[in-house]
């Protein structure tokens, strides 16, 4: 096995040296009449000891065909593709830029570029050890929270006087704590109502005739249109009392 690998490496090195010195393909004289076209071909490649290209009488280097972007392929890119074919690795493609240069782009790296923002090669390595559960997570903290659904552990206890409730997650405890304090962190952008939970706000805001989903993503936007606040008044929200008109002067 090692001898085969050494043979492949030697052949690859020989190919690289032939490319760097400028391989030349000569076409021999036409063969005798009636012979096929292959009879007159004489393919020769310059060796390591070939005459340098700058000396008189040296054959000109072969012209490379222009690629799709108009730029000629560099010898090291051709050598890289030959080595990739020999070793069975990914083929390196070239993307032509507007300035006329080329930059190597690996097809495997382009295929593995994540669209979700995670680092390449990230995987859900934290798997649930419980039998019959195939869930996996990117972070160990997420797995730890999931394990509590199996064990029934609730480490987050409410410290409000007279309340003995416990929760498996800290965000559940924080949401429950607002039921004691009366804090309503989610205001409706179309009326004066506020809510302790965001899902309650979404359910309420959809009842407005002028509701748009983007309004919930802009917390300072408010509308004073009476038609927008009509569903809130129907639901029991306080309506402003009419302002009495001033009495005529002289009475």
From Swiss-Prot:
Start-end of C2H2-type zinc fingers: 126-150, 156-180, 186-208
Disordered: region residues: 48-72, 95-125, 201-251
Family annotation (Pfam families): zf-C2H2
Expressing tissues: High expression in brain; olfactory tubercle, olfactory bulb, nucleus accumbens, striatum, hippocampal CA1 region, amygdala, dentate gyrus and frontal cortex. Moderate expression in hippocampal CA2-3 regions, piriform cortex, septum, and distinct thalamic nuclei. Low expression in the cerebellum.
CDD domains: KLF16_N (cd21573)
Biased composition regions of type Low complexity, renumbered to the chain: 95-123
Protein purpose: Transcription factor that binds GC and GT boxes in the D1A, D2 and D3 dopamine receptor promoters and displaces Sp1 and Sp3 from these sequences. It modulates dopaminergic transmission in the brain by repressing or activating transcription from several different promoters depending on cellular context.
Family to which the UniProt record says this protein belongs: Belongs to the Sp1 C2H2-type zinc-finger protein family.
Protein name (database record): Krueppel-like factor 16
Organism: Mus musculus (Mouse)
Taxonomic path: Eukaryota, Metazoa, Chordata, Craniata, Vertebrata
Gene for this chain: Klf16
């Amino acid at each position: 096995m090692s001898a085969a690998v050494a043979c492949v490496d030697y052949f690859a090195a020989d190919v690289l040296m032939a490319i760097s010195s400028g391989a030349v393909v000569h076409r021999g004289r036409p063969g005798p009449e009636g012979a096929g076209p292959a009879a007159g071909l004489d393919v020769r490649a310059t060796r390591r000891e070939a005459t340098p290209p700058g000396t008189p009488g040296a054959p000109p280097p072969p012209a490379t065909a222009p690629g799709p972007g108009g730029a000629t392929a560099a010898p090291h890119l051709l050598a890289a593709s030959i080595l990739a074919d020999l070793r069975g690795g990914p083929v390196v493609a070239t993307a032509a830029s507007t300035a006329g240069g080329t930059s190597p782009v690996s097809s495997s790296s382009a295929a593995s570029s994540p669209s979700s923002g995670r680092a390449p090669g990230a995987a859900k390595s934290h798997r649930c050890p419980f039998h019959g559960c195939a869930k996996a997570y990117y972070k160990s903290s997420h797995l730890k929270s999931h394990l509590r659904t199996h064990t029934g552990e609730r480490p987050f206890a409410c410290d409000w006087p007279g309340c003995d409730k416990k929760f498996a997650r800290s965000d559940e405890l924080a949401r429950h704590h607002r039921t004691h304090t009366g804090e309503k962190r989610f205001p409706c952008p179309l009326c004066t109502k506020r809510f302790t939970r965001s899902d309650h706000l979404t359910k309420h805001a959809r009842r407005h005739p002028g509701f748009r989903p983007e309004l919930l993503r802009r917390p300072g936007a408010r509308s004073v249109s009476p038609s927008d606040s009509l569903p809130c008044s129907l639901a029991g929200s306080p309506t402003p009392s009419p302002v009495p008109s001033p009495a005529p002067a002289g009475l």
